[in-house]
Amino acid sequence: MTEPWNEIAEWWVETVRDDPRDSTDLLELLDELIGGTGGLTLDLGCGEGQVMRHVGAPIVGTDISGRLLTVAADAGPVVRASLPWLGWVRPDSFDRAVCIGVVEMVKDHRRLFSEVSTVVRPGGHLLVAMNHPVSTVPDSEPLVDESGAILWRWGDYLESGSLAQHVDGHEVVLYHRSMGALLEAAATAGWRLEQLIERGPSARTVARFPEYEGQEQIPTILGCRWTRDR
């Protein structure tokens, strides 16, 4: 997995800069979740450091791509590692973890929630902003009925699955889990849900991608804030 992410690092940096769904919209969602938290922060899947720069020090980033970490290192210390493994971190050493646009790229979400609960201290926080599960279902898509209303084809929403995107000959996979599956996995790992936010396409996104017009009430991003109970 490491080599593909290194090969498409430049594509990813440009995507983050150009697409409000991967940048401004998710950062604004993070801002709604982050209030009342603080301290030493772990940025999970930090990529080129967008979130590290937004949140500010003290923060440590981790990612699988050495090329992306070269850019992120300007924002703070970084560690090259493959999620969900966090064995390089001492237990209870972080006050909070942020995971922006990454949960859906990790195949083993249960292990991710479990590993993060080990490295964040009791009472600490996990802040997640991600593609909404409605939008990651294979074969899900908008539909227009006879009246012109835009509806949504759910596909096999309750079944776990994956979507593959091909970039310059490399495969980027998004893993689909239902909302219930995500929340159950987090709760099992000792995370207590404090806040959940759903958002449709922003005006900024609709202006950039006009095909989203009329879909503003269909959720595209999800934000969750958890506290570690144990």
Where are the regions a protein language model picked out?
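A short SAM/SAH-binding and catalytic strip from SAM-dependent methyltransferases
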Residues: 96-109
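A short glycine-rich, Lys/Arg-flanked "PGG" loop and its adjoining helix->strand segment in the class I
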Residues: 110-125
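Short alpha-helix
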Residues: 162, 173-196
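C-terminal lobe and adjacent flexible extensions of AdoMet/dcAdoMet transferase-like proteins
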Residues: 185-230
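A short acidic, Gly/Pro-enriched loop at the edge of an enzyme's catalytic core
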Residues: 86-97
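Conserved class I S-adenosyl-L-methionine
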Residues: 1-37, 50-54, 68-71, 126-161, 200
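Class I SAM-dependent methyltransferase SAM/SAH-binding core
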Residues: 42-86
